[in-house]
Amino acid sequence: VVAGSVGRRSTSFSERPKEALRRGALMKMLQQNALTLPLFISKEDEKPPPLCGAVPAEPNYVAKVGDMVAALARGPDDDENWILAEVLHYNHSSCKYDVDDIDEEQKERHTLSRRRVVPLPLLRANPTTDPGALFPKGALVMALYPQTTCFYRALVHEPPSGPQEDYLVLFEDSSYPEGYSPPLAVAQRYVICCKETRKK
């Protein structure tokens, strides 16, 4: 094995027609990833563990290499966005993560402090047995906008009604008169607590 080649992805963008295909494949992979997230089945008097549905991680939790996270990263235009990223490394002495933008077109690597990284749920909550492990109707959250790799602020319109169901969320969107999008479906995997980002 050539040193440094492990886990590297192809960065050849000469095949332009393949970009749409790659993007379609990425969206399919993200959807698949959400569907295969294990469902937590609680026993009597058992509480859902951290990172089950809306249950936050422990304060000292460190995401593992390969985990998907939401990361507040600065883009090429100097704007900051919460992006879907993969953890490459965590430096315990500096308390910083190295993460890779999951979007191949951006393919940016970022070094970020812990407060700029939010781990995604590792388990789905079962609405039947653990409704308290879900964000309630009206909760302010961050959710992955459908067909993108960015998280945006949204209000929960309806929590999942069954283990296989998605949230229905209303994204903040000034192009609509009410300031919110129509209800859009987002999987539990990609709905997290809202981190306040300072307005410019």
Tell where the protein language model's regions lie, with residue ranges.
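Eukaryotic chromatin- and chromosome-associated nuclear factors
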Residues: 1-200
